[in-house]
Amino acid sequence: MNKRKPVVALVGPTSVGKTATAIELALTFGGEVVSADSRYLYRGMDIGTDKPTLEERRGVPHHLIDILDPRDDYSLALFQRDAQRAIEEIHARGRLPIVAGGTPLYLRALLEGWRIPPAPPNPELRAQLELRARREGPEALHRELQTVDPVAAARIPPENVRRVIRALEIFLTTGRRMTELEGREAPPWRVLWLGLTMPRDELYRRIDERVDRQVARGLVEEVQRLLEQGVPPDAPAMTALGYRQIVAFLTGQLSLEEAIQRIKYDTHRYARHQLTWLRRMKQVEWYDVTQPGWYEQLRERVERSLREESDEGDVAVHQSGGGKEAPRA
């Protein structure tokens, strides 16, 4: 009988410190990181995504980072395929996959065995919906989605225009809701869900400080460079938080100060949405990163889970001696 192999899923809102924690766990337990952050996929989008540098990765292999041109489209089904392949390859090397990210839809589709609705893209309809989003605003499309598929609307925030459009596209093409077409099958892995959190005021402070750092590091120049390289301002990658607001500044729709404040406000809202989604997942074990000893408790939880697997003859626990101190967020 084949037992399911282990996967650690590290979740939480933006700015809570998932990336640094995933790297520390990987160093401790012989792991590799699989990114479940939709923004990390794109090359040349480093500052606005707060993507870890090679130095910050500390030699830990990372997967699904810098695999796309910003002009490329990407779907949930493609992410699921690519991430599954990465996990299988990591297991084949006898190492521990650590899936880390804040895109709830990606995490759940991958680790809960979702079957993606079999509705082919409709480019003409999609173009019409994209035009409406630009003219009427993403909230208008989200209200329409609430009318035809309230379950999908509850789990897709208005800011995720691509997913809102895809859900509407599925309904308008097939006459059925996305949530009716979705299915699930048991994932082939044993997933340990670990969540990082902190008081909301502290989280907002971290978000605001990060945005200020990004602007100081050259966020405006990064967006300008992408536009000069021919990336359309309405490309899927450019709808990411931080990028669309700076595009609005560069095209004269907002002042720089207004754009910065909009980034902070929209990121606060996105963090709330992430937490709302993740709090519904009863399998997640939460750790408050502002509490003393939180990382040691989390490390011990992973060690205990892997030891239970090892006792059953599935995997070995590889510890390098890392994880003695809490990682920096």
Curated annotation (Swiss-Prot):
Binding site for ATP: G12, P13, T14, S15, V16, G17, K18, T19
Keyword Methyltransferase attached: no
Binding annotation for substrate: T14, S15, V16, G17, K18, T19
Lineage summary: Bacteria, Pseudomonadati, Thermomicrobiota, Thermomicrobia, Thermomicrobiales
Function recorded in the entry: Catalyzes the transfer of a dimethylallyl group onto the adenine at position 37 in tRNAs that read codons beginning with uridine, leading to the formation of N6-(dimethylallyl)adenosine (i(6)A).
UniProt keyword Nucleotide-binding present: yes
Matching Gene3D superfamilies: 1.10.20.140, P-loop containing nucleotide triphosphate hydrolases
Source taxon at top rank: Bacteria
InterPro entries, per database record: Dimethylallyltransferase, IPT, P-loop_NTPase
GO biological process: tRNA modification
Cofactors: Mg(2+)
NCBIfam families xrefs: miaA
Quaternary structure, from the entry: Monomer.
Region (Interaction with substrate tRNA): 37-40
Assigned protein family: Belongs to the IPP transferase family.
Organism: Thermomicrobium roseum (strain ATCC 27502 / DSM 5159 / P-2)
Disordered: region residues: 306-329
SUPFAM superfamilies named in the record: P-loop containing nucleoside triphosphate hydrolases (SSF52540)
EC number, UniProt record: 2.5.1.75
Protein name per Swiss-Prot or TrEMBL: tRNA dimethylallyltransferase
HAMAP family in the record: IPP_trans
An example molecular function term from Gene Ontology annotations: ATP binding
Record PANTHER family: TRNA DIMETHYLALLYLTRANSFERASE
Substrates-to-products reaction catalysed: adenosine(37) in tRNA + dimethylallyl diphosphate = N(6)-dimethylallyladenosine(37) in tRNA + diphosphate
Ranges annotated as biased composition (Gly residues): 320-329
Site label Interaction with substrate tRNA, positions: T103, R126
